[in-house]
């Protein structure tokens, strides 16, 4: 019998289920969404009045060894009101925006809440758009799309090249030291100190009271993995309802009113959710300077030892790195599992072997397992709107949280996922006519994702991700390949031998994969990969059978958009960038560095 989970405090996940004659399934939580306020600046003001001295955000300034710098709820409210007052003085037209170039910081949050209070939509973007150099194509695209009247770059010296070489039109720049910049296109460059010194009065109060639930408050960019990013319109209603359903379902177990640690970028909805979810729960968020990548993860590990949070969130690659560290470091194991009650993963599926490995470590350390959950959602749904909040040992995408209605439309052996609820976007900025493609005839948002049941006879056991419909491709013989689902299966089969992989084979005779190995691929390692894949291939058809494996040495490139801010791989971009590696998989006869699986007599045989 498996050890118990640490105590959780989840509400009922009972669903009302309707099955139509055409196979379509409609699922709605029986539990209604709790009442909530559709005005985040008012939420901030209320928290500041209730506990003005409590830490809201904390950051390290000057590197991982620097002390934490704390910002209380009272300080955040005062600072954001000053910024709002300054914005209101600029008398900006309603079709403009505020563009945030900087990453996660206390000042970033104040600027964002200040823009909300002044009813000027804010658009936080990946720092890579401004820092990676080149022709700044994505940054220029965003500028043309959101038409910023104000640009915020916290440290002008860090963004100097972009600020001097990109045309920002007639925008005003807010930065720490305008004097470090040479010639720019900005109409005016203003110091941050001057902005936050602005006196806030009744004008700010009136602006906050005038906020309506359905006006644009944020423009959040899509990942842009297959095209230039779109700007998703996010409203106060979207954000508030999404935050409310998360608190209702996960908040008590996760301890969002306590200390939180998170690195996820605020230019992405998951990171932005954590920042605002902490606010609406009255908690304290410590901004993690670490990242789940070699050379950057040690800071996260040190922070975990210090803070020992109840809740931890990361991408699957981060959990793989954490499991490695936990196995090496007894002190980390003791401190990490001491208070942990809930672990959340996102960005990709969590391989079952990694889940089992993590639970083994938890049981060895504290005698109980840790409940894992995940959120399913998109930029268009504010953030995660489905979650695992019911007893299960299976990974997946869970069930709808209160307030969301799920529509499952049959698609071969899977279901297309469609969603409806107050957390769904009204559309994209400057994309008239797009709504007809975004929504079906009943008003459900078409996610483009597919799912299957963990148990076809029992919806209550939840759903699991079955790939992006847009990631499907055909082999040369016309056989369809569900690449997203296949990738998740392979990650599970090959964990922990590999970090990630690319599925190859579009218009080819057979499937191959390119993998990022977890160690140098010596003969023993190659043999282990071959044995795993030979077992994996047993009983599988051409749409899932892997014939060859290539080993990648260059890590996924952030600058080339191969990896998103949240750490997931953009398969299409990576395959295009590594076309030479893909072609090498199909050279005849097979080249020596490519591993052949399952008796392909055109290359190296599997040694068993």
What name fits each language-model region?
Residues 52-55, 174-175, 180, 187-221, ...:
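Conserved pre-ATP/AMP-binding loop-to-beta segment of ANL
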Residues 77-83, 196-202, 213, 232-253:
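Conserved structural elements of the adenylate-forming
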Residues 69-74, 208-210, 217-244:
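Conserved AMP-binding A3 loop
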Residues 240-259, 267-331:
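Conserved AMP-binding/adenylation subdomain of ANL enzymes
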Residues 415-475, 601-603:
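Conserved ATP-binding/catalytic segment of the ANL
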Residues 57-110, 130-140, 191-197, 234-237:
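Conserved AMP-binding/adenylate-forming core of the ANL superfamily
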Residues 190, 194, 281, 301, ...:
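Gly/Ser/Thr-rich phosphate-binding loop
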Residues 129-167, 183-186, 199-201, 242-261, ...:
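Conserved ATP-dependent adenylate/AMP-binding module captured primarily in the ANL superfamily
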């Amino acid at each position: 019998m498996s050890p118990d989970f640490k105590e959780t405090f989840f509400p009922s996940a009972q669903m009302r289920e309707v099955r139509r004659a055409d196979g379509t399934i409609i699922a709605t939580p029986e539990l209604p969404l709790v009442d909530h306020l559709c005005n985040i600046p008012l939420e901030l003001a209320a928290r500041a009045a209730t506990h003005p001295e409590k830490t809201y955000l904390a950051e390290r300034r000057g590197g991982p060894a620097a002390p934490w710098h704390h910002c209380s709820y009272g300080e955040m409210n005062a600072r954001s009101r000053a910024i709002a007052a300054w914005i209101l003085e600029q008398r900006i037209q309603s079709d403009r925006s505020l563009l945030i170039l900087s990453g996660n910081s206390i000042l970033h949050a104040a600027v964002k809440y200040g823009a909300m209070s002044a009813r000027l939509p804010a658009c936080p973007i990946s720092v890579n758009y401004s820092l990676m150099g080149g022709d700044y194509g994505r940054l220029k695209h965003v500028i043309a799309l959101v038409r910023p009247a104000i640009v915020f770059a916290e440290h002008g010296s860090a963004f100097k090249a972009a600020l001097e070489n990109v045309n920002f039109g007639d925008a005003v720049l807010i930065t720490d030291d305008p004097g470090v910049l040479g010639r720019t296109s900005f109409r005016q460059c203003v110091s941050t100190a001057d902005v936050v010194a602005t006196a806030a009065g009744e004008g700010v109060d009136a602006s906050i009271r005038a906020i309506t639930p359905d006006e644009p408050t944020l423009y959040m960019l899509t990942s842009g993995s297959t095209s230039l990013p779109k700007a998703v319109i996010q409203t106060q209603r979207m954000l508030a309802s999404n935050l409310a359903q998360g608190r209702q379902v996960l908040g008590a177990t996760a301890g969002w009113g306590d200390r939180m640690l998170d690195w996820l970028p605020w230019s992405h909805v998951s990171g932005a959710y954590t920042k605002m979810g902490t606010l609406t729960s009255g908690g304290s968020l410590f901004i993690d300077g670490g990242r789940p990548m070699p050379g950057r993860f040690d800071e996260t590990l040190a922070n975990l030892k210090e803070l020992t949070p109840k809740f931890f969130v990361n991408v699957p690659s981060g959990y793989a790195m954490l499991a490695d560290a936990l196995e090496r470091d007894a002190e980390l194991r003791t401190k990490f599992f001491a208070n942990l009650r809930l672990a959340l993963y996102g960005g990709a599926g969590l391989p079952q072997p990694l889940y089992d490995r993590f639970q083994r470590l938890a049981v060895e350390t504290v005698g109980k397992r840790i409940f894992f959950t995940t959120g399913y959602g998109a930029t268009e749904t504010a953030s995660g709107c489905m979650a695992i909040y019911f007893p299960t040992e299976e990974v997946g995408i869970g069930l709808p949280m209160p307030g969301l209605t799920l529509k499952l439309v049959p698609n071969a052996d899977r279901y297309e996922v469609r969603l409806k609820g107050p957390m769904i976007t009204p559309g994209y900025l400057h994309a008239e006519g797009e709504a007809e493609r975004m929504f079906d005839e009943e008003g459900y948002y078409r996610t483009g994702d597919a799912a299957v049941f963990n148990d076809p006879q029992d919806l209550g056991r939840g759903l699991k991700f079955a790939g992006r419909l847009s990631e499907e491709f055909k082999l040369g013989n016309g056989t369809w390949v569900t690449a997203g689902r296949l990738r998740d299966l392979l990650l599970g089969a090959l964990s922990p031998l590999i970090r990630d992989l690319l599925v190859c084979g579009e218009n080819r005779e057979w499937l191959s994969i390119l993998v990022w190995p977890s160690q140098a691929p010596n003969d023993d390692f190659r043999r282990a990969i071959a044995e795993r894949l030979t077992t994996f291939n047993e009983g599988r058809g051409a749409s899932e059978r892997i014939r060859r494996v290539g080993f990648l040495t260059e890590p996924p490139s952030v600058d080339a958009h191969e990896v998103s801010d949240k750490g997931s791989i953009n398969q299409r971009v990576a395959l295009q960038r590594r076309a030479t590696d893909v072609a090498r998989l199909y050279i005849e006869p097979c080249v020596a560095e490519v591993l052949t699986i399952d008796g392909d007599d055109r290359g190296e045989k599997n040694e068993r």
